[in-house]
Amino acid sequence: METLPIFMKLRDRPCLVVGGGEIASRKVSLLEKAGASVTVVSPELHPTLAKSLAEGRIRHLASVFEPAQLDGAVLVIAATDDAEVNRAVSREAQARNIPVNVVDAPELCTFIVPSIVDRSPLLVAVSSGGTAPVLARMLRTRIETLIPATYGRLAAFAAEFREAVKQRFSTGQQRRIFWEDVFQGVIGEQVLSGQEEAARHAMQQVLSGRGELHHGEVYLVGGGPGDPDLLTFRALRLMQQADVCVYDKLVSKEVMALVRRDAELIYVGKSRDQHTLPQEDINQLLVRLAKEGKRVLRLKGGDPFIFGRGGEEIETLMENGIPFQVVPGITAANGVSSYAGIPLTHRDYAQSCLFTTGHLKDGSVNLDWDALVRPNQTVVIYMGLVGLPEICRQMVAHGAPENLPIAIVQQGTTQRQRVVEGTLATLPGLVERAGLRAPCLIIVGQVVRLREKLAWFAPSPEVVSAG
């Protein structure tokens, strides 16, 4: 190890930055975040630095560097484009035993400014010791995706209860075990999901001996339309820490592959006229599993609150006092239309968008047809594959032109995506010949014409033909 990672407390302490350009402005910004009292030495200032000066956040010495300017400084950064000046700053700072960093010159530095993942008060620093800063930044980017932005709130929450926990537990080992349980349990998740008041109440109950630290919870997570890259960071984190996963038919196999490997998997998918479990039984299953103390992932395709019956499920959870959180997902209308190259709104074609379902019941589809055939809008129909012929007939019967563009997308956003385009008059026959299978999404409106120009996603031909 060539360098020792340390964190310096700089609040209200004098720091000197030599240089007034863009790079210097970035270094000044870092020092400002740490609360330092910053003086910039430069004949001229970058607009960002000039703004900071006008707002009274920094001091400015409008001159070239002089050694006397180092007097009193506890840290120095040289960020000029003059190599000789940078060497002089390094030499004079080291003669005074002042830590010095020279940008892009590790041989002149006594400290390195790392790449930083800021989740204040939690900080992660990544450094290559000046040998490969680009690699360090790439690694920092990967770490950024692994640490939720709300981890800073979790660290601040822990600080709030630190003394109370010290009073409650006498040994370091007891405190460590307690905090691990807090961070990995319901209280930690409440903080991360923004339910801090509930977390404080639960923490106070536990510390007073009136509450339990270990109890179950439910994560109602939207798995998106199929492509796992469209998952949110929070969805992925909860998927990888659940004890049991209750999942639907519409969750793609690629998304399911990201669920914690040793989690129990319970399939409750529904298809037309065939339900593995009635909805009320699913609701009660979630309650039972949570009461067993398990972290339950309720994973749904798309978004749980858009035709996903998520509202019914959390009603039951609330009635039974089960902690839960809801993680939105990209609904099929958004994700699938984007991957199909069909914008849902467009200045020239559609100023509004309507979502509905196309369930076929007793040979008919019961929809507000007058609303569906209004001009200058896009209609998106979920679960309408079987009812497609009836949908097209009814739209024409209620005034829509037979040549109105319409498209249907099978397994959108995945490598098995297939798109069939036509009109209200022609699409049912085209779909029958194509042999499409659910899940499918129907898009009706003039925006479908744009697909010819805007289609960008090209699944593997081998996969599509095999599907």
UniProtKB/Swiss-Prot annotation:
Then it catalyzes the NAD-dependent ring dehydrogenation of precorrin-2 to yield sirohydrochlorin. Finally, it catalyzes the ferrochelation of sirohydrochlorin to yield siroheme. This is Siroheme synthase. The keyword Lyase applies. S-adenosyl-L-methionine binds at P225, G301, G302, D303, I306, T331, A332, M383, G412. Residues 1-203 are annotated as: Precorrin-2 dehydrogenase /sirohydrochlorin ferrochelatase. It comes from the Bacteria. Its EC number is 2.1.1.107, 1.3.1.76, 4.99.1.4. InterPro entries: 4pyrrol_Mease, 4pyrrol_Methylase_sf, 4pyrrole_Mease_sub1, 4pyrrole_Mease_sub2, CobA/CysG_C, NAD(P)-bd_dom_sf, Siro_Cobalamin_biosynth, Sirohaem_synt_dimer_dom_sf. The modification Phosphoserine is found at S128. In the N-terminal section; belongs to the precorrin-2 dehydrogenase / sirohydrochlorin ferrochelatase family. It comes from Methylobacillus flagellatus (strain ATCC 51484 / DSM 6875 / VKM B-1610 / KT). Pathway: Cofactor biosynthesis; adenosylcobalamin biosynthesis; precorrin-2 from uroporphyrinogen III: step 1/1; Cofactor biosynthesis; adenosylcobalamin biosynthesis; sirohydrochlorin from precorrin-2: step 1/1; Porphyrin-containing compound metabolism; siroheme biosynthesis; precorrin-2 from uroporphyrinogen III: step 1/1; Porphyrin-containing compound metabolism; siroheme biosynthesis; siroheme from sirohydrochlorin: step 1/1. Gene3D superfamilies: Cobalt-precorrin-4 Transmethylase, Domain 1, Methyltransferase, Cobalt-precorrin-4 Transmethylase, Domain 2, NAD(P)-binding Rossmann-like Domain, Sirohaem synthase, dimerisation domain, Siroheme synthase, domain 2. Keywords: Cobalamin biosynthesis, Lyase, Methyltransferase, Multifunctional enzyme, NAD, Oxidoreductase, Phosphoprotein, Porphyrin biosynthesis, S-adenosyl-L-methionine, Transferase. Residues 216-467 are annotated as: Uroporphyrinogen-III C-methyltransferase. PROSITE patterns: SUMT_2.
